Amino acid sequence: DLKALLIKAGYENVMTYIQSGNIVFKSSEASKKTLTKDIGEVIEKHYGFAVPLLILTGEEVEKIIKKNPYNDGKKDASKLHVTFLDSMPEKKLLETTRDEKFQSDEFYIDHTIIYLYCPDGYGMTKFSTMFFERKLAVTATTRNWKTLLELEKLATMKDE
């Protein structure tokens, strides 16, 4: 499995969450660019196909959690999601996308992070990963709020 593959590749304290490609690990390599390249090569060599990767430090995950404008205790946390963009979108695309509306759904773009609040559920929103990829011309991935909180817990455990 992926956990064993990364341990074999030399990564430490490897933990996975719900078999969805969410991994927490420790590495002496500080460059996220190098880590992305190296892990991408390990995965492609083993599985025979490339996958887009997004690597965040534990500190980045904590910051993302703290900055969520919808995590105010007034909104149902099960309706919160975060979309991660692989790069900063062009200003013009950001401006036109910010004006999009859909029912009572809300989103807030903070550089390469999009905070989503979907009161009717993520499955009912037009603000999907594909929507943002298409509108912003980037690669993206979305996680629900619970997953993000669990990844933060795993990252904290890793440091103990």
List where the protein language model places each region.
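Surface-exposed, charge/polar-rich loops and edge strands
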Residues: 1-20, 24-160
